[in-house]
């Protein structure tokens, strides 16, 4: 049985994939680690006592997961990698799959130091520091780090019954990403390059397609619809909607290609930036009534709040 938990990390993504044989865990993978906070400074605080938000590391502990065969990072925004430290405090990892691996001797980036960089450039450094710092501190808890080149689709057989394709954006993005981050770790901090890359992070987001017993699960990361709606996409059973169901996350054209039977939106309730966007939620409901939200999202007349620590799906 394949067990999927789209964890309610509040603002962010973290998805636990497990293959079970009875009560025995055969395989486990975590895709992204959520945010380093259950709330954001620019979002209203959680006032509902029924809130079930949980850090990814704490969710793993609650499920008795002490080891991940694979930890996959889609990209380096704070709401996807901020929880890495808590995850590595909780579990050991067989293999980390990532679009960028910091140099082995890399030190802190000190994004808040007196570096003369604009705020947007500092934010890029801060996100990378939240990723690289735990790798330094807990590197002995990771068996292997594999940097994915991004120039071709990666096809992995995870178990006898479970396979995964890892899909990328434009191939030219990933050498550029490496050049910008490597320069930052060398102390060469070009504000323009950092800001420009910060605007490219979502379009570089990895996507995954899982295959299990004739079912297909698409995990869209933060990839905007226009980046992959022109590609050959086949119908899927479950779609993790890209980019928190923002207005740029999906289109009618993409949904016609994917034809999801169920959709999951990883998003915090009460966001002031229309994520999830009501139009996108309406569009999703045109294709499937089976639309789930990780947090207790409420859109009058469209979505009623549901309080849970994860959207839990089991596939025999």
Can you describe what each PLM-predicted range is?
Residues 79, 106-110, 115-123, 228, ...:
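Internal alpha/beta domain cores that form substrate/cofactor-binding pockets in large enzymes
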